[in-house]
Amino acid sequence: MYRLRRKRAAPKDIYPSCKISNTCPPDIQNKIEHTTIADKILQYGSLGVFLGGLGIGTARGSGGRIGYTPLGEGGGVRVATRPTPVRPTIPVETVGPSEIFPIDVVDPTGPAVIPLQDLGRDFPIPTVQVIAEIHPISDIPNIVASSTNEGESAILDVLRGNATIRTVSRTQYNNPSFTVASTSNISAGEASTSDIVFVSNGSGDRVVGEDIPLVELNLGLETDTSSVVQETAFSSSTPIAERPSFRPSRFYNRRLYEQVQVQDPRFVEQPQSMVTFDNPAFEPELDEVSIIFQRDLDALAQTPVPEFRDVVYLSKPTFSREPGGRLRVSRLGKSSTIRTRLGTAIGARTHFFYDLSSIAPEDSIELLPLGEHSQTTVISSNLGDTAFIQGETAEDDLEVISLETPQLYSEEELLDTNESVGENLQLTITNSEGEVSILDLTQSRVRPPFGTEDTSLHVYYPNSSKGTPIINPEESFTPLVIIALNNSTGDFELHPSLRKRRKRAYV
């Protein structure tokens, strides 16, 4: 079985690591150190044969100084090399000799000590002109100090100047209603002593400030009505002229986008329902992101809206103003109509827009006033005052009750009497055509209840009456029947006592 030959690293990579441990293969060591058989032949042969200038063994390939010479031709060919740029030299400043100071010639025969010259006693005194201001005599007294011996006192003569005479006036007013108690421990800056000094400056008849008349405030219950007059039609300090309606120009380029107006209001909030059928388990945020539809072009599928056929991408909504001033919602769509063999989808780009309807003005609904009536209103207070507010009703139709003087009512007016309600009733029903139907309510037989029943009125008199009492026969009793009517259909529900009798054994 043949084994594949594994490639090893380059000799220049193997030699540095194996040289340290002295484990280099012979071929790699001879090649790197130039000790192969060919290298030795050149080394030994160069001792007897001069091959100067040919560049043999230098690995440069330049052919030496004369270059390569083809066979049978004269002259050499120089291999082109990279030219070396010539750089200008740095100018060197010339350094000259330093300045030469003259040195006096020393007389060798002269003395070693130089004698001083005698210039004489008359020196010229220069005259200096000084310009200074003359200051007046100071008022500070001059102090003359004299020398004293030890043990004697020093005497200073102080001269007094002309002191300025000053007048100090003092005025004191005693207030009998206020007395300041003088204490010994007065704090710093305390001026509340028994003497009070007022310093004032006369200002003449000049009045400082402005006399502003005050307006009386209305503290009553009246309402202060104020009106605001609008001076200008604009609401800001710098009015701006009416700007033309803004429309995104990049959407209305007919060379790039096809303009399609959508009439379905689902385009604003649910545009995905116009391309594919709704998925109730997925509700994306359509106001912030774009929509990408994964559809197979080979499989033909019907879309809910024909204008959105083959649409694979819808951008997020963009709002603008249409020429009429209404709000317009725009979306950019990309269609995938044609597909190449490589799988590239090609389609037109369409601008879908939907114009929102104008907001209709609010309908004015007439509201009924609350708390108003056309009757007479009586307002009474604890003080006995009675106020009447007259309405549309005549004064004779109302009864005025005075709260000042109490009125006594008779016992007959205060006695409670039983009024018979529900006797001889008839049910009248009117339909939409105006026909009247009258139903006679027949009295049903009422089974007497078990036990004693007393429906009469007993009046208790503490004093016994004389004579035989008169007993009036009882009036016929008619039961009260309640019938619930439905105004819309004219139907009614009978009382349970009027239902059809059934053969049922009573216990």
Swiss-Prot record:
Residue window of motif Nuclear localization signal: 1-9, 500-506
Entry GO CC: host cell; host cell endosome; host cell Golgi apparatus; host cell nucleus; viral capsid
Subcellular location: Virion; Host nucleus; Host early endosome; Host Golgi apparatus
Entries under InterPro entries matching the protein: Late_L2
Xref: Pfam families: Late_protein_L2
Main location: virion
Signal sequence residues: none
Annotated disulfide bonds: C18-C24
GO biological process, one term: microtubule-dependent intracellular transport of viral material towards nucleus
Domain of life: Viruses
GO MF, one example: DNA binding
Post-translational modification: Highly phosphorylated.
Keywords from the named record: Capsid protein, Cytoplasmic inwards viral transport, Disulfide bond, DNA-binding, Host endosome, Host Golgi apparatus, Host nucleus, Host-virus interaction, Late protein, Microtubular inwards viral transport, Phosphoprotein, Viral penetration into host nucleus, Virion, Virus entry into host cell
Protein role: Minor protein of the capsid that localizes along the inner surface of the virion, within the central cavities beneath the L1 pentamers. Plays a role in capsid stabilization through interaction with the major capsid protein L1. Once the virion enters the host cell, L2 escorts the genomic DNA into the nucleus by promoting escape from the endosomal compartments and traffic through the host Golgi network.
Family recorded in the similarity comment: Belongs to the papillomaviridae L2 protein family.
Subunit structure: Interacts with major capsid protein L1. Interacts with E2; this interaction inhibits E2 transcriptional activity but not the DNA replication function E2. Interacts with host GADD45GIP1. Interacts with host HSPA8; this interaction is required for L2 nuclear translocation. Interacts with host importins KPNB2 and KPNB3. Forms a complex with importin alpha2-beta1 heterodimers via interaction with the importin alpha2 adapter. Interacts with host DYNLT1; this interaction is essential for virus intracellular transport during entry.
HAMAP family for the chain: PPV_L2
Protein name: Minor capsid protein L2
